[in-house]
Amino acid sequence: MIHSTAKIHPSAIVEEGAKIGENAIIGPFCVVEKDAEIGKGTILYSHVVVRGITKIGEDNRIYQGASIGEINQDLKYQGEATRTVIGNRNRIRENVTIHRGTAQGGWVTNIGDDNLFMVNAHVAHDCQIKNRCILANNATLAGHVELDDFVIVGGMSAIHQFVIVGAHVMLGGGSMVSQDVPPYVMAQGNHARPFGVNIEGLKRRGFDKPTLHAIRNVYKLIYRSGRTLEEVMPEIETYAQTESAVSFFLDFFARSTRGIIR
C-alpha cells in the first residue's frame, strides 16, 4: 500500500505489495521490493535499493547508492525468509550496505534509532545495533556484532564476528577489534587495545563527576589492578549498588563470550 501523501519519482521501481508511509519520498532510480515497508517521512534520495523483508521506520534519510536488506554473505544462507529492521531517524549515507539476517543468527539484522552510518559503512547479517551509534567512513561490522548505545566506530575499522561493543565506547580509526570491548572504554589499534575511559564523550552526555569517578575506578580494577576479572567482580558489583552507570559493566560481562580486549 502506498500512502496518498507519499511521493515516488517516475523512474523509481516500487513493487506491488510494498508499503510506503505518509509523506515518504522515493527518489529517482530507487528500487523497493514487494516485502519492504518504508515508514512515515523517510526519504530515499536516489539509487537506493531496499530488498527482501525489510522494515524501515520513520524520518530516516537514506542516500544514493545505499543497499538495504540485500542477501547476506553467509555461505550457509539458503534463501530463508530472514529480515532487516531499521528504526527511526537514522542517517544512512552513500553506498552503505546493510544485509539481512540468517536462520542461524536469530533471523534479523536490527538497527535502532538515531544512528549515523557514514559513506561505505557495512553492517553484516544478524548485527544488533542499538541507538545513537556512529559508524565512520568504511567502518565494517562482521556478522552477529552487537553495538550498545552511543558507540563510535572510527573510519576504516573492522569488528570481528560475534564481538560485543559496550555502551559509550569510542574506537579509533583503523582499529581491528577481535574481542569484546567493555562500556565507556576508548580503544584503538590492530589489534585494538584499551587506553582509557571516554571521559569527554561522557561529559557531553551529562555524566556527573561522582559517576565519572566510579567508572574510572572500575576501569582501573579491570585493566590496572593486575587481577583477573573474576577477582575484581565483587568490587564492581559494589560500585553498581550506588552508581547505576556501573551496572552497564555487569550487563556487558553477562553477555560477553569472546573475552575482552587487553
Curated annotation (Swiss-Prot):
Q: Record's PROSITE patterns?
A: HEXAPEP_TRANSFERASES
Could you give a single Gene Ontology term from the biological process aspect? lipid A biosynthetic process
What the entry lists under Gene3D superfamilies is as follows: Hexapeptide repeat proteins, Udp N-acetylglucosamine O-acyltransferase, C-terminal domain
Q: Where does this protein chiefly localize?
A: cytoplasm
| Keyword annotations from UniProtKB, A to Z | Acyltransferase, Cytoplasm, Lipid A biosynthesis, Lipid biosynthesis, Lipid metabolism, Repeat, Transferase
Relate the protein's function as given in its record.
Involved in the biosynthesis of lipid A, a phosphorylated glycolipid that anchors the lipopolysaccharide to the outer membrane of the cell.
Q: Write the protein's name.
A: Acyl-[acyl-carrier-protein]--UDP-N-acetylglucosamine O-acyltransferase
Supply the source organism for this entry: Actinobacillus succinogenes (strain ATCC 55618 / DSM 22257 / CCUG 43843 / 130Z)
